[in-house]
């Protein structure tokens, strides 16, 4: 059985036991989270939401907090000696899907 969930402005196809990296969620390692925004539940008898599947939820456990690779943002104006260099590391949360209820 699999499901499509929505979190952090993105959609993810998840299955039980799968490890996943999503946009940052508040919580520490070992905390339980529940996703109620389930768009689709697939399997023997798939359920498609309009837009959400009523009564469906996905349970997960936070396995860690992490940050992505650093990107460099560089702005400049030609001939004006204007330069700004900035770095950014996006925070992520690592999850393990523990259950899907439909």
From Swiss-Prot:
Q: Which UniProt keywords apply?
A: Ribonucleoprotein, Ribosomal protein, RNA-binding, rRNA-binding
Share an example GO biological-process annotation for this protein: translation
Cellular component, GO annotation: cytoplasm; ribonucleoprotein complex; ribosome
Tell me the SUPFAM superfamilies matching this sequence. Answer: L21p-like
Query: What GO MF terms are annotated?
Result: rRNA binding; structural constituent of ribosome
Instruction: Report the domain of life of the source organism.
Output: Bacteria
The free-text function statement in the UniProt record for this protein reads: This protein binds to 23S rRNA in the presence of protein L20.
Entries under PANTHER family matching the protein? 50S RIBOSOMAL PROTEIN L21 (PTHR21349), LARGE RIBOSOMAL SUBUNIT PROTEIN BL21M (PTHR21349:SF0)
Question: What is the similarity comment for this entry?
Answer: Belongs to the bacterial ribosomal protein bL21 family.
Q: How does it assemble?
A: Part of the 50S ribosomal subunit. Contacts protein L20.
State what protein this is by name.
Large ribosomal subunit protein bL21
The species is Sorangium cellulosum (strain So ce56)
